[in-house]
Amino acid sequence: ALTGTLTVSANGDVKILPSGRMQAATDLSAQSGRNIVNEGTVTAGGALALNAPGTVSNAGAMSSAGNASVVARQLDNRGAFTAGLQADGSISPLGALSVQVNSLQNAGTLMAGGNATVTADALGLSGGKFVAGGALTLDANGAITNRAGSVYGGSVFLRASSLDNTGGKLTSGGALTVNVAGAVDNTAG
């Protein structure tokens, strides 16, 4: 939908191939009965909303000029996922990212110009980059693993049962709050 809103709804998988493109001038919403798999390019000129009972997998590029949200069992990001990306390449501080999953695996780049909130049972951030220009909230019932990963927020709030930040970077431009019930490994972090 080059001039308006695009809504995609499927009982099965929603899949964008490497040469494929799904684009909306304003809001883009994809609802799958199973999984959402992006190996190409997904672009929303407004908000981006992804909802699947299975996995949202991104090995390509996903972006929204406005807010982006993911509700799924798992988010597996090996590509670039950006909330607040403008047509001129700048990042808007109004682009917030909200992720509600059982498991987040990020070996790629997650970026929000504004706030970013992840609510999950477990977060795997190893080898990836996660950047929020505003407040970054990582709220995990289980473990957060950030081996050789890079996490930055204008402020950072992290809650987990354990934290493995071996060789990782956890950086805040302001307040940094870490609430871990169990073990913390910050070797070379």
Residue ranges and their predicted role:
Residues 1-8, 12-23, 27-30, 34-38, ...:
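Extracellular beta-strand scaffolds
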